[in-house]
């Protein structure tokens, strides 16, 4: 048997053991809880890492796809540029044209721009009048015959049928006078007054409200398409009087003659009047010779311009004609004084 003192000591030892056991158990619980939290945290990190990895992979794939697309587009553009350059380099040959002096400024300008695109092409352009241009293209001595009138007006039926018409623009013809005539009071003439002047019936400007000086006609040869157009629409078909000392179908020369000669009158296409030409235009029955009035059907003296070929044109000539009639070049026509055919509200005179 244990004494009371021994039993008390045993009890103290037992209590101490239980406390130690409890403390150890609680510590183990805490450790397990900590491990669980760390495990969850690790799983989270792993998940984030996986997601990041996927995102990086997706981003890389997108970047790669975009780069591939860009490279493909660049290659396509390069191929197109190469094809265009090859086509530009491949177009060679020569083009000859003759005829209408009214159309010549446009054809000259278009030729300069065309040669910039196709430097291995040469283009030669002469005037000479619509009749001469139609004659030469019919004979095969030029590739293109430029004309203010239809081929049937200058050639016989058989010759005219051999030609192919390429209608390129509208040209307006304006009566022009020396500046002293306008300063003397002549700004507007009726059609009848114009007829009387050009047929020789009226010989002094004072008869139509102008200065007391003789009227000097600066005329064109019968081969001129500009003359044919002016006679038909300004003179109602009446034949104009001849003045051989002042006759020319070179519009530049005609313009200079009117500018230098007191009392002079003539007519040119608006394309020769885009700058300060040094002459004055005259209205007909109150309608000024402008593109706007031509489009609206108010001004009567205009015509379509034609570029004829004998049969279908060869490749280089066709490419040139297509260029003149393209939207690319069409935007420039009006600045040169020519009308765009599609803007005509009334194609009947």
What residues fall within each predicted segment?
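Bacterial N-terminal signal peptides that target proteins for export
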Residues: 31-41
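Short, Lys/Arg-enriched N-terminal segments with co-localized hydrophobic residues
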Residues: 4-31
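Sequence-pattern detector for short linear motifs
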Residues: 10, 38-39, 81
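Exported/periplasmic ABC-transporter solute-binding proteins
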Residues: 55-56, 61, 66-67, 72-73, ...
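Alpha-helical transmembrane segments
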Residues: 44-48
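C-terminal motif of bacterial Sec signal peptides marking the signal peptidase cleavage site
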Residues: 49-53
